[in-house]
A protein has these predicted regions:
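Conserved N-terminal alpha-helix of the aminotransferase class I/II PLP-enzyme fold
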Residues: 66-113
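Histidine-centered active-site/metal-ligand motif
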Residues: 61, 92, 141
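Conserved PLP-anchoring active-site segment centered on the Schiff-base-forming lysine
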Residues: 121-142
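N-terminal "arm"/small-domain region of PLP-dependent enzymes with the aminotransferase-like
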Residues: 2, 13-75
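Short coil/turn connectors at secondary-structure junctions
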Residues: 44, 104-106, 129-132
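Short glycine/serine/threonine-rich phosphate/pyrophosphate-binding segments
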Residues: 110, 115-121, 142-144
Length: 145
């Protein structure tokens, strides 16, 4: 099989169907919210971003930035691994404990994204519950459809 030709053809199909993903380069300078800089080739243009997960612009709040810098200086960057090997820190555990407490639950588990949370949940339920049927419609999050 000519894999190069096969995958080139598949990529072209995605492009023709409008399903090929092009990632937009967007930089969000501090004190510019909700405006941002979008790079299109060599050109930069101002855009407004209302689709990020940083709804309240907390990532640019001075206290959040200061605490982030403080934590980076204490423990460095990155978890060192996935959660199931060496990537669970006391910070993860403390956050999960606080989330469980706030929501009056026994435990909580944080995920890197809503997508991974949804995928993990559906996969686990489907594997553990015999004959489970999952119904979804176009109003659900894209990761559930």
């Amino acid at each position: 099989m000519d894999y190069s030709k096969f995958f080139s053809t598949e990529l072209e199909k995605l492009k023709k169907e409008g399903l090929y993903r092009n990632f937009r380069e967007i930089d969000r300078p501090i004190k510019k919210f909700p405006k941002a800089d979008e790079m299109q080739g060599e050109e930069e243009r101002d855009v407004e971003v209302w689709c990020s997960n940083d709804y309240l612009n907390m990532s640019q709040h001075p206290e959040v930035i200061n605490e982030t810098v403080k934590t980076l200086l204490e423990i460095g960057s990155g978890s060192g691994g996935t959660r199931n090997i060496s990537g669970t820190s006391s910070y993860h555990t403390a956050l999960e404990k606080k989330l469980a407490e706030v929501h009056n639950k026994d435990n909580a588990l944080i995920f890197a994204s809503a997508y991974t949370a949804n995928q993990s949940t559906l996969w686990t339920l489907g594997k553990k519950i015999k004959n489970l049927e999952i119904f979804s419609d176009e109003l659900n999050h894209a990761s559930l459809i």
